[in-house]
From Swiss-Prot:
The keyword Magnesium does not apply. SUPFAM superfamilies: ATPase domain of HSP90 chaperone/DNA topoisomerase II/histidine kinase, DNA mismatch repair protein MutL, Ribosomal protein S5 domain 2-like. GO terms for molecular function: ATP binding; ATP hydrolysis activity; ATP-dependent DNA damage sensor activity; mismatched DNA binding. It comes from Streptococcus uberis (strain ATCC BAA-854 / 0140J). GO terms for biological process: mismatch repair. The keyword DNA damage applies. Residues 408-436 are annotated as: Disordered. Keywords: DNA damage, DNA repair. This is DNA mismatch repair protein MutL.
């Protein structure tokens, strides 16, 4: 029988580090939380090689005394709790005394610190958990911690690190969450000499949101507030027109601590009710102030899982707060955003059709090969240009948020367009069960589409439409009912499949380039996956903080589709993560065909309906949309006669057969 021994302290710390320190982002999280607990108001994070080479955290907090400095890297040595009762009223982000010892055991650590009441500072250098030296130095009040060669003595952990861009995206996400949880602190994140994130630290949460997600996003966030005897809920949620493809943009904070909680996520979605499209999620920042006795944060090594007493009451409070705030808002999307762009085009407006409350008449333009809606004639002319001094497309947020841009970019802003996301994201989904994240299901669908055989199509004569959704046509074999959305989706799919598959290298130069704004984490991930976009003819170049510029577009993409199209491509690339070029092209064709097709409640004139049927007849497989739904159903003459009892197979009563 093996003998039980007590593990050496260094080995025990390395084992503990496996729970607390999963990746470089974990180091950043723990050290920044310590800086916040030290009442810092300015925190600078400097990263080299995504944190694997170097992580440097500098703050202007209270600092540590010369006596306390060596104790800081001992396990379970902390200044934040003193006895058992303190464990049940934790208000600090850290309290276990595990972070620094864990980091010190798997890296080369350097701590420079000074307090306000000390004439000098202290330096501590440790490697692998062992203190190498401690000396007196001159340093400003606060603390600077440098972590180098992370995981140098745990090669197994280093082996399974993801790409540098992926690890950097995790770091940016951590800093963003901490910034949202503490808008009173000014955060600066610098990666390999390049500034990635910067917040002002004014205490204005909406201004922090603008610094992280962009000015245009912050302008579409509305404030929520609710409280009872146990909880205070406050924060901002996006209008239903502004959504994302995953839950990554939902930030829930309890007493300033970012947490993950499925039930609270569900409460947020319940607050939106039916205003969100299936598979779309809002941008949310909610801060919950709670008595520490009602929340137990000591249940997980990363402290991101929290047990909450009276959780059902809190869920109801959140749902009500969101529902009430949305109820007081005008949820009709603002048309002024695109007014300047629409005036420079022709009077006939070409657009991706949407699902309106009332049916709209569609017309077909053979030159543009697309459907459009005629704009109603106006009694007075309104001319607004982007240069008009009386009209501002991008205003300050509540007169407090100011856009921080370099002078060279400001001067160039007049010659670029700020792209906005399509406002039809929240229309009812024609395919609620389509899930691009389901790899197995998508592979089966793509394989089925690749093996389609060319089919013949009957000659049809269009004669009517029902509810702006279904077309009626007759042929030699009887009556055919066609789903107009599925029909055009099939037509568009084969078009995009052909164009994206070939990826014509011909590009059209844009007269005015477009700017596309993303969050810091998404910006980094897109840089890593830019080759996928290049393969389909989209070339985005970095342009300032978290922004790409598009100077040219593939000739197969209409200029009117650029803004929504590029955002949709990027969203899908972020959603599907690792895909092959072949799979990405196939999924992109499916997605674009669905979003570019006419929806229900659109009445087609005779010419448009006949042209759609003609296009459908030329498809390789006109009988199913890319998702497998039927495009049309067929009733033979015999079927019609049976339905009206004009013929019966025998003289047996249908009532006797149990059919009626």
């Amino acid at each position: 029988m093996s003998k039980i021994i007590e593990l050496p302290e260094i080995l025990a710390n390395q084992i503990a580090a496996g729970e607390v320190i999963e990746r470089p982002a974990s180091v950043v999280k723990e050290l920044v939380e310590n800086a916040i607990d030290a009442n810092s108001r300015q925190i600078t994070i400097e990263i080299e090689e995504s944190g694997l080479k170097s992580i440097k955290i500098t703050d202007n907090g209270e600092g540590m005394s010369e006596e306390n400095l060596p104790l800081s890297i001992l396990r379970h040595a902390t200044s934040k709790i003193k006895n058992q009762s303190d464990l049940f009223r934790i208000r600090t982000l850290g309290f276990r005394g595990e972070a620094l010892p864990s980091i010190a055991s798997i890296s080369e650590l350097r701590i420079e610190t000074s307090t306000a009441d000390s004439p000098y500072g202290s330096l501590l250098v440790a490697k692998g958990g062992q203190i190498e030296r401690q000396e007196v130095i001159s340093t400003p009040v606060g603390t600077k911690i440098t972590v180098e060669n992370l995981f140098y003595n745990t090669p197994a952990r280093l082996k399974y690190m993801k790409s540098l861009q992926s690890e950097l995206a995790h770091i940016v996400d951590v800093v963003n969450r901490l910034s949202l949880g503490h808008p009173e602190v000014s955060f600066t994140l610098i990666c390999d000499g390049r500034e990635m994130t910067k917040t002002s630290g004014t205490g204005d949460l909406k201004q922090a949101i603008a610094g992280i997600y962009g000015l245009n996003t912050a302008k579409k966030m509305i404030e929520i507030s609710n409280a009872d005897l146990d909880f205070e809920v406050s924060g901002y949620v996006s209008l239903p027109e502004l959504t994302r493809a995953n839950r990554n943009y939902i930030t829930i904070l309890i007493n300033g601590r970012y947490i993950k909680n499925f039930l609270l996520n569900r409460a947020i979605l319940d607050g939106y009710g039916s205003k969100l499209m299936v598979g779309r999620f809002p941008i949310v920042v909610i801060d919950i102030q709670i008595d520490p006795y009602l929340a137990d944060v000591n249940v997980h090594p990363t402290k991101q899982e929290v047990r909450i007493s009276k959780e059902k009451e809190l869920m109801a409070l959140i749902s009500t707060a969101i529902a009430e705030s949305l109820k007081s808002q005008d949820l009709i999307p603002d048309a002024l955003e695109n007014l300047a762009k629409s005036t420079v085009r022709s009077s006939t407006k070409y657009e991706q059709t949407k699902l309106p409350l009332q049916s709209s008449k569609l017309y077909f333009d053979p030159q543009k090969n697309d459907f459009y809606i005629k704009e109603p004639q106006k009694t007075t002319e309104l001319t607004v240009s982007e240069e008009s001094p009386n009209f501002t497309l991008y205003t300050n947020i509540d007169n407090t948020v100011k856009e921080d841009r370099n002078l060279d970019q400001t001067s160039a802003s007049a010659s670029v367009k700020h792209a906005s996301r399509s406002q039809d994201e929240n229309q009812l989904s024609e395919h609620p069960n389509l899930d691009f994240t389901n790899k197995q299901k998508m592979e089966q669908l793509i394989s089925k589409l690749e093996n389609e055989k060319t089919s013949t199509f009957p000659e049809l004569d269009f004669f009517g439409q029902m509810h702006g959704t279904y077309l009626f046509a007759q042929g030699k074999d009887g009556l055919f009912i066609i789903d107009q959305h599925a029909a055009q989706e099939r037509v568009k799919y084969e078009y995009y499949r052909d164009k994206i598959g070939k990826v014509d290298t011909s590009l059209q130069q844009l007269l005015v380039p477009y700017l596309f704004e993303f969050s810091g984490a998404d910006f980094i991930q897109l840089q890593e996956k830019m080759s996928f976009l290049n393969e389909v003819g989209i070339f985005l170049e970095p342009y300032g903080m978290n922004t790409f510029i598009l100077r040219e577009h593939p000739i197969w993409m209409k200029e009117s589709e650029i803004e929504s199209g590029v955002y949709e491509m990027c969203d899908m690339l972020l959603l599907t993560n690792q895909v092959s070029i072949k799979t990405y092209r196939a999924e992109l064709a499916i997605m674009m065909s669905c979003k570019r097709s006419i929806k229900a409640n659109h009445a087609l004139d005779d010419y448009s309906a006949r042209h759609l049927l003609e296009q459908l007849s030329q498809c390789q497989n006109p009988y199913n949309c890319p998702h497998g739904r039927p495009v049309l159903v067929h009733f033979t003459k015999a079927d019609m006669e049976k339905m009206f009892r004009r013929i019966q197979e025998n003289h047996t009563s249908l009532r006797d057969l149990g059919k009626y």
